[in-house]
Regions:
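Short hydrophobic-aromatic micro-motifs
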Residues: 10-11, 20-21, 76-77
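Metal-dependent nuclease catalytic cores in nucleic-acid-processing enzymes
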Residues: 17-33
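Long, charged, mostly alpha-helical binding arms that flank functional sites
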Residues: 2, 7, 34-187
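A short glycine/serine-rich beta->alpha loop
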Residues: 6-16
């Protein structure tokens, strides 16, 4: 028999290593004489901000639906992926989520607010032909070069299962290169 592997990896909590991971491999070996998946991504645990296991009984658990309602799903995801590598335990702190919302998403929002009025004034519609690189100002060539380097490096991080490094590279690009340099010098 031939087994169809739909995904090349499985991601589960570190507490599932002996149970779920092993069971899937044992079944696949017995039934299909093959492995169940090619790679394992073992997620760490989400702990409270002091490094303790979250528990309703202790009152230190965070309601995920309440957190999504309060902060939004994108800031929560971004905080969790850029705060620590997925295989490490994450000390969850709502102050960190607020900081991500302000520093990363606020910067993205403000960058767009800088761009939008000028684009609207010029009648920009995303349908225009590309401006040849040689006809662009030096600052535009610089940010596009930085963007292309970012894309290459983020792709390499993802290929190496390093989403935290990828997220931090994006963070640095948005906060440093795009906002602090490009937007400020273009004003």
């Amino acid at each position: 028999r031939q087994m169809c592997i739909r995904d090349s990896f499985i991601a589960e909590g570190v507490d599932q290593t002996r149970g779920w991971f092993f069971t899937l491999h044992a079944i696949a070996t017995m039934v299909f004489d093959s492995v169940a998946y090619k790679n394992v991504i073992s997620n760490g645990l989400v702990l409270d901000k002091n490094g303790n296991k979250m528990s309703k009984r202790l009152g230190n658990a965070v309601d995920p639906f309440g957190a999504i309602e309060q902060y939004g799903s994108d800031p929560l995801r971004w905080y969790m992926i850029t705060n620590s590598s997925p295989w490490d335990n994450l000390k969850f702190d709502t102050d960190g989520v607020m900081e991500v919302t302000r520093k990363f998403f606020g910067t993205l929002h403000n960058t767009y607010k800088f761009f939008a009025p000028y684009a609207n004034l010029d009648g920009f519609t995303y349908q225009e032909a590309d401006v040849p690189m040689s006809k662009r100002p030096e600052i535009d060539r610089w940010i596009l070069s930085e963007l292309n380097s970012l894309i290459k490096n983020v792709d390499m991080c993802y290929a190496d299962y390093e989403p935290t490094k990828a997220g931090r590279l994006i963070n640095d690009f948005v906060n440093d290169n795009l906002s602090n340099w490009y937007v400020r010098l273009c004003r």
